[in-house]
Structures are given as structure tokens and as C-alpha cells.
Swiss-Prot record:
Gene responsible for this protein: RALFL17
CC annotations in GO: apoplast
Biological process according to GO: calcium-mediated signaling; cell-cell signaling
Protein name (Swiss-Prot/TrEMBL): Protein RALF-like 17
Family: Belongs to the plant rapid alkalinization factor (RALF) family.
Location(s) in or outside the cell: Secreted
Function recorded in the entry: Cell signaling peptide that may regulate plant stress, growth, and development. Mediates a rapid alkalinization of extracellular space by mediating a transient increase in the cytoplasmic Ca(2+) concentration leading to a calcium-dependent signaling events through a cell surface receptor and a concomitant activation of some intracellular mitogen-activated protein kinases.
MF annotations from Gene Ontology: hormone activity
Cystine residue pairs: C37-C51
Signal sequence, renumbered to the chain: 1-29
Key words, A-Z: Disulfide bond, Hormone, Secreted, Signal
């Protein structure tokens, strides 16, 4: 019961494709270890610590610009 040539080529191409996707995924994970949490060495300080980006002081929510009361007037539709 020998495996056909097409089956072996299909398995080899599947292996190459999976290897490509693993490299792409590990490249995205490497970005976290370069900067963010735990001092840049890729480790977290505590077991329960999560990587959270610091919020800038001048960061303003857009909600303030959407809902405004102008001259305390009511608008009826």
C-alpha cells in the first residue's frame, strides 16, 4: 500500500502552508514581547497582570462633542 505521488505532494504543501501561518502568527506575538508589558523582556510582572496601554492625558472622548446642551433649549421633533 504505497502512497500516491499526489497525496505526498498534498501533505508537503499543507505542511509548508501551516508553517507559513505559524510564522505569521508568531511574528505578531513577537511585537508584544518587544515593548509593552513587564519591562520589554516578554514576561509579565504578576501571573494575573494584563498588558494594558497607558491612556494619554490629552486623550479626549468624542462623546463630549456629540452630546451638547446649547443654551438649555429643548428641541422637539
Amino acid at each position: 500500500m504505497a502512497a500516491s505521488r499526489e497525496f505526498i505532494i498534498c501533505c508537503f504543501l499543507t505542511l509548508l502552508l501551516c508553517n507559513f501561518f505559524m510564522r505569521v502568527e508568531s511574528g505578531a506575538a513577537a511585537d508584544v514581547s518587544r515593548g509593552g508589558c513587564g519591562g520589554g523582556d516578554g514576561s509579565l510582572g504578576d501571573d494575573n497582570e494584563r498588558c494594558v496601554e497607558a491612556v494619554k492625558e490629552d486623550d479626549d472622548d468624542d462623546v463630549d462633542d456629540v452630546y451638547k446642551v446649547i443654551n438649555k433649549m429643548r428641541i422637539y421633533a
